[in-house]
């Protein structure tokens, strides 16, 4: 191919030595986007451009974004991967060597076609990609699994939320089983995809030594864990439940104390997972 030959992929025209805008030549994949945070610092390495997708099947009692549950919520914005990537690149100078794009939710895997489109185009121009997921949509059945395999080719890191290690307690906390969630954790280990395990610590729901010990044992079976994070429960999203006319299920439950947070970190051996410092 000559140096001047161009390849059109949607919004961008790629040419050796540069990136140029072009007219759309194919029908773009459209995603339902809840919101965007242009300068995130806790959802992946470095400074992140965070895309919050619409839609989630779980009904976590501690959810601080219940307005993301309905995938076709009329308030959601219709965005293409090219559109989102163009906006993200406005902030590229802040990312440094480790920053990039994180897609969260809601549950982004419910819109896996959009994810593939966005992450593929991001990787073609050298942008770091992180997926923040609870894993509930995961299945080995087709066509999802083939799509997920492709998505992983363009994903640098997975932020993986394990809400509760006990299946019955997980159902009580989220309304869903964790069977396929744990299967996804094992699969990500099998393909050696870097993950950060995240666990929301909720008094009287997930903050029990018995379940933390079981979670610790499970994490130790995985070979790809670069970091383990404790996310203390908070009530900042309570007002959204009230605005939506929903009863807040954790009424009267306060955030965990510093002692309980320290206890959870000790049981999960969070200080032993330092792989993220080497990447």
What residue spans do the PLM features occupy?
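Auxiliary Fe-S-binding modules of radical SAM enzymes
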Residues: 9-42, 196, 201-279
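Short glycine-enriched, charge-decorated loop/helix-capping segments at active-site entrances
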Residues: 67-75, 171-177, 245-254
